[in-house]
C-alpha cells in the first residue's frame, strides 16, 4: 500500500456489541498490528441492536482480553449503521442470526459480497455451511463460555489476516494499474 491508499476496513458484528464482536475487534486489531498492518487496516465492531448501545464491554470479556494483554477500556457499544455496508470492506458476522440479519439488510449485491461468517476463516470450518459457523453468545454463561469465544475467534484470525493481506495486495496492484489510491471491495 502507498501513503495515499485508504485503510482496509473490517467490522465484527454481534447482537449487543459488548461480548463477541468487541473481543473479535481487539483480537483482529492485535493480529493486524503483529502482521505489520496497523496503519493499513482498521477494525471496529457493532451490534445488530441498540440494546447495549453506550455501555462498556462485558466485564467477563474484558477479563479474558486483559489476560492476553488486550485492553478494552475504551470500548463503547454501538448499533450497526446502514452506511457501513459501503464503508467496510469485510463484514464479519459472529453468529447465524447476525449473518441472516446483515444479508437481509444489505442494500445490494456488492454489500452482500462483503458479508462473511467470522468462523468461515477457521480452516476446520471454512468449507462448512454458515449455519455451522456460529459463535454462541457467552452473555448467558460463565467464564468458560468467554474462553470458548476466544478460542473460536482465535482459530479464524490467521485466515482473516491472510484474506485481508491478499485483498490489500490485489487492490494495490489494481490501484497501481489505474493510478488510483483507494481500496476497493475485495474481489470474489
Predicted segments with their positions:
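Phosphate-binding/catalytic loops
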Residues: 90, 96-188
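Conserved active-site segments centered on acidic
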Residues: 2-87, 165-172, 178-184, 188
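Helix N-cap/beta->alpha junction signal
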Residues: 21, 95-96
Amino acid at each position: 500500500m502507498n501513503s495515499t491508499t485508504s485503510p482496509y476496513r473490517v467490522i465484527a458484528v454481534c447482537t449487543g456489541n459488548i461480548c463477541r464482536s468487541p473481543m473479535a475487534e481487539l483480537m483482529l486489531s492485535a493480529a493486524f498490528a503483529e502482521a505489520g498492518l496497523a496503519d493499513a487496516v482498521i477494525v471496529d465492531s457493532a451490534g445488530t441492536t441498540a440494546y447495549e448501545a453506550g455501555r462498556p464491554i462485558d466485564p467477563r470479556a474484558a477479563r479474558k482480553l486483559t489476560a492476553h494483554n488486550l485492553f478494552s477500556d475504551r470500548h463503547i457499544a454501538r448499533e450497526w449503521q446502514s452506511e457501513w455496508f459501503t464503508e467496510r470492506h469485510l463484514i464479519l458476522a459472529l453468529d447465524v442470526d447476525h449473518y441472516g440479519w446483515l444479508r437481509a439488510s444489505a442494500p445490494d449485491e456488492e454489500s452482500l459480497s462483503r458479508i462473511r461468517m467470522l468462523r468461515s476463516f477457521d480452516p476446520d470450518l471454512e468449507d462448512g455451511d454458515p449455519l455451522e459457523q456460529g459463535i454462541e453468545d457467552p452473555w448467558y454463561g460463565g467464564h468458560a463460555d468467554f474462553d470458548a469465544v476466544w478460542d473460536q475467534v482465535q482459530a479464524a484470525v490467521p485466515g482473516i489476516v491472510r484474506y485481508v493481506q491478499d485483498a490489500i495486495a490485489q487492490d494495490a496492484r489494481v490501484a497501481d494499474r489505474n493510478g488510483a489510491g483507494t481500496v476497493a471491495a475485495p474481489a470474489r
